[in-house]
Amino acid sequence: ALFIIIYSYQLLFVPVSLLGRAVERAKRKKGSQSKPPALLRYAVLICARNEEAVIGELIDSIKSQTYPIELVTTFVLADNCTDATAEAARGHGAIVYERQDTKHVGKGYALGYLLARIGEDYGDIFDGYLVFDADNILMPDYIERMNEMFAGGKYEIITSYRNSKNYADNWISAGYGLNFLRDACCHNHARSLLGTSCFVSGTGFLFSRRIKNKIGGWTYHMLSEDIEFTADQITSGVQIGFCRAAEFFDE
């Protein structure tokens, strides 16, 4: 009973999200006269462990974006791999680093290592950093939509609409798919409409160069490093935005 009471406020998010979608559709029908956004430079960060079977599909979906491809650089960290993840990623055109470290294990350590190597080799040339898991696939306009919001200057951290890649496979994948829907539509979308901060959930998010420099790369190493990152930024006064138009698929 206590659990239900604590989480009952989330019931408010459902009508807020539904009403918000209706308002957004009406605005799209009217059209917008806003000027085109600035075209910013992005680094895509992918930390992968034994993902040779799927990583090529993600890289291909990045290369097929409607956003100018010369402004997007894809970096892969083959982390403690025992398969051909590095070779597969290179074969699809990514810049690949490799790490073997059985003491500092986990995505948080991998992201920190990858950002440090990028800083050594490329300096601070990227305006924003996009984070994905190796089994993701992006809609063709994903980066274009994220850039529209990011270039507006209101948000330095933006999360996006995570959809299911394999909803119909079994009851477990269906459960994950429904959870993705709940996070996107009933939580982050509603929170953004109410003017409160959204949350980052593992993959499909963007953070600015200033945020990277402020925290010193990536310093979150808990098992749920995404929630650690979210909590740290919100308590520091940073509001996290949600871009519903930027859709990607996850397993």
Residue ranges and their predicted role:
Residues 60-71:
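Short, acidic, metal-binding catalytic loop of nucleotide-sugar glycosyltransferases
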Residues 77-86, 101-103, 137:
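A conserved acidic beta->alpha catalytic loop
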Residues 1-38, 89:
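N-terminal membrane-anchoring/stem segments of glycan-assembly enzymes
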Residues 56, 83-90, 98, 141:
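Acidic helix N-cap motif at the loop->helix transition within catalytic regions
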Residues 195, 221, 230-249:
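Catalytic donor-sugar/metal-binding loop of nucleotide-sugar-dependent glycosyltransferases
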Residues 40-43, 73, 228:
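Cell-envelope/extracellular polymer assembly enzymes that use nucleotide-activated donors
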